[in-house]
Amino acid sequence: MAIAIGLDFGSDSVRALAVECASGAELAASVEWYPRWREGQYCDGANNRFRHHPRDYIESMEAALKSVLASLSAEQRADVVGIGVDSTGSTPAPVDAEGNVLALREEFADNPNAMFVLWKDHTAVEEAEAITRLCHQPGKEDYSRYIGGIYSSEWFWAKILHVTREDSAVAQAAASWVELCDWVPALLSGTTRPQDLRRGRCSAGHKSLWHESWGGLPPASFFDELDPIINQHLAWPLFTDTWTADVPVGTLSAEWAQRLGLSQTVAISGGAFDCHMGAVGAGAQPNALVKVIGTSTCDILIADKESVGERTVKGICGQVDGSVVPHFIGMEAGQSAFGDIYAWFGRILGWPLEQLAQQQPALREQIKASQKQLLPALTEAWANNPSLDHLPVVLDWFNGRRTPNANQRLKGVITDLNLATDAPALFGGLIAATAFGARAIMECFTEQGIPVNNVMALGGIARKNQVIMQACCDVLNRPLQIVASDQCCALGAAIFAAVAAGVYDDIPAAQQRMASQVETTLQPRPAQAQRFEQLYQRYQQWSISAEQHYLPSAAKAEKAPQSQAALTH
């Protein structure tokens, strides 16, 4: 029986999953945390800098793969036919002429600018705004029209420009820049040199301004106008061709075959972003909105080319032919914070406990156990008394806003507090905020003529916290399907590996056998949905008002009258 392995590189850890190709049975899984990241190395949260050392990825991947393989029998290990890879994104890094990430070299070993710039790094806000302005110049080609019309600080070129401006040593040493989801398959197949490395359609189309209609990347003149420093240090074009993730980039290199005890015939599929492969693992069909929920969310919708036509959807994170399933248009949206908002509130409430633990070391374990119960206790308390009459209205922009209309200058806003607001009520407001953000994304599609036939949710929060999911269901006022697998992203990567290895002819055929099932379907509660509708309208009014306070200073005065009117309706 052929076995495929999926690798899912998340923000905190990497997951490896072995899947039987014929049945979709999940045979073994392993999760390995990134050791340097776990210690907070190379990050500066106050300044929105989040970097991953490449050794974190390499060491954790090897440990996860070896753990999974150790759980298989010798016969099963011999049946491994392919490895697929997904990752967060945009998470690019500078590489040298051999394709080594610069931080793997001694002189750059502790330089954060020589590492992978994690998706949620927002140090490049000004660079992103400059790219957006350049794309919208009258009379010129709008290279942002297939990525929603706004270039984000979370994306490829903004990060490259920021690091190139900030660090001349890295700029001089970098032969190219590579997305994590493209670099790992190249590492495993021994094809890391920039001229050998295959760039994925997913990362290139959604984050790098690549599109077939203008021949790939924007012309050199575009980057010269943005800032000549890019073309001074990097050869244009950085790349030309892209590949969908079902196409193998090669087979397992001799080095990695020896390290893992696998055959060199194991196919390595192309890479893609985690949420895109998660949608495939969830078995998504056209016009299903799939919410991959974790620290943030990524929302994926696929549509057939004929139904989309020449339409461009504004305010999303891109529409790319083949970024999810080959021959379909993949559309991406998302919330910059979801689980991270709940974790923030837990840290706020846990601060006194941390102080007590320092003062009373003997109570440390008991206090640690109490901290772990904070959020479950808050969830239960709000579920037992879910009053919506005095619910704080919160804007879920704690890490900026990804969709609709990316804006990483935005901050979280909490409104409608009074002296009776307690911790469960405020936590309920945070739950509602994440649900409101989810609805805003759904409406971004439907109001522009892209139908949403059903909504699916996957990930740990989706399966383990029905209170939060029911609130989302009520706010959306639609049935909400909860996907059974906890490991849909890794499962999706395994599905691509199976196709790359030739076990199946295409992704839909592999999905029929390997994709996860729906575990349960939640239904909206009419009374709650009606009350949430009123609160959602207030959320929208506050959004209009609050956003004006985070505009670049030159635009604030011009927008002021609109913000004052928003809350008088």
Swiss-Prot record:
One of its GO terms (cellular component) is cytoplasm. Pfam families: FGGY_C. It comes from the Bacteria. Gene3D superfamilies: 1.20.58.2240, 3.30.420.40. The keyword Kinase applies. Disulfide bonds: none annotated. It is an enzyme of class 2 (transferase). GO terms for biological process: L-arabinose catabolic process to xylulose 5-phosphate. The keyword Transferase applies. Pathway: Carbohydrate degradation; L-arabinose degradation via L-ribulose; D-xylulose 5-phosphate from L-arabinose (bacterial route): step 2/3. It catalyses: D-ribulose + ATP = D-ribulose 5-phosphate + ADP + H(+); L-ribulose + ATP = L-ribulose 5-phosphate + ADP + H(+). Its EC number is 2.7.1.16. One of its GO terms (molecular function) is D-ribulokinase activity. Keywords: Arabinose catabolism, ATP-binding, Carbohydrate metabolism, Kinase, Nucleotide-binding, Transferase. Belongs to the ribulokinase family. This is Ribulokinase. The gene is araB.
